[in-house]
Amino acid sequence: MSRYTGSTFKKARRYGFSILENGKEFSKGKKRVTTPGQHGKDKARLKMSGYGAQLQEKQKVKFMYGMTERQFRNTFAKAKKVHGGILGTNFLVLLESRLDNIVFRLGFAMTRQAARQLVNHGHILVNGKKLDIPSYQVKPGDSIEVKEAMKKNDKIAEALQNNESTVEFVKVDKANLKGQFVRLPERQELNLEINDALIVEWYNRLIK
């Protein structure tokens, strides 16, 4: 299944959920409660079944991290093999530990999609070595740096200037465009609008 590349705002509005986690998709006077379409479809949509709620939660988080269904499902399967902890939390921690997400959290890109492009194009170093795999699982203590040739890039400078992230599991040296994945995040540090229990229910039926 291909990765969605359409309008971020349109998709965010459909889910009533800020994909960028800062509400900027709704900053042009549009309300997040409005569903795309002529009049938000019909009101029956509000009375969602358990199956529908699970599917929607899975879809919105998959879109938030910019992953294909196969990538998302494989990450969940990996989370099921983690010993200890809560499955839903372990799953979110694996998503947060992706290299493209850490680049986004450090503020080197304004969106996860832009962060993924930086990684894909070889503009990111991990522990001093070029790494162009967005799904790479960054480990606590790993250092992440923008390649020297890109350190004067206007888009990266703009992203850093507008970065509003306050998460404490990463630290960034804005002057030198370097950062570190300090530790694994705690559940309360991650998006509290995500109902990971619904995603667990969805995939537990499919992955044994």
From Swiss-Prot:
GO biological process terms held by the UniProt record: ribosomal small subunit biogenesis; translation
UniProt cross-references to Gene3D superfamilies, sorted A to Z: Ribosomal Protein S4 Delta 41, Chain A, domain 1, RNA-binding S4 domain
Highest taxon, organism lineage: Bacteria
GO molecular-function terms, A-Z: rRNA binding; structural constituent of ribosome
Keywords for this protein: Ribonucleoprotein, Ribosomal protein, RNA-binding, rRNA-binding
SMART domains: Ribosomal_S4, S4
Protein purpose: One of the primary rRNA binding proteins, it binds directly to 16S rRNA where it nucleates assembly of the body of the 30S subunit.
Assigned protein family: Belongs to the universal ribosomal protein uS4 family.
Subunit structure comment from the entry: Part of the 30S ribosomal subunit. Contacts protein S5. The interaction surface between S4 and S5 is involved in control of translational fidelity.
Listed name of the protein: Small ribosomal subunit protein uS4
Species assigned in the record: Mesoplasma florum (strain ATCC 33453 / NBRC 100688 / NCTC 11704 / L1) (Acholeplasma florum)
